[in-house]
Amino acid sequence: MTIQGCYKKMGADYEDVLKRLYSESMIRKFARMFLTDDSYPKLERSLKEENVEEAFRAAHTLKGVCQNLGFTNLYQPTYELTEVLRAGTLKGAKEWFDRVTEQYNITIEAIRAVQ
């Protein structure tokens, strides 16, 4: 699969990220780097530990990475989760985290399919 096909599969905004990164090879490079980003595992762990502060930081980081890479499919639920956690509560966090997880898995699967 091409990187453009990857973005299409995950429902992300390839054209937007192309404006920022200028080339398909740069997009591919940074998308692959996302596979080693630790913000999602930190978010998952922090939520299990009910550590709102750490969960907020991890969600905020993940949100920023998604925005920079044009992963709009993952950005939106991560944004919503970040706002829930910003209020200092876990109320509603599980539901948003479930949506984040769904989109995260779609994103990871699509990136791994890039040749």
Across the structure, where does each feature detected by a protein language model lie?
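Short, structured coil/loop segments at alpha-helix boundaries
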Residues: 1, 23-24, 71-75
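Long, amphipathic alpha-helical coiled-coil segments characteristic
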Residues: 11-61, 91-115
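Short, well-ordered alpha-helical segments
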Residues: 39, 51, 55-58, 66-86
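Intrinsically disordered or compositionally simple regulatory linkers and C-terminal tails
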Residues: 3-5
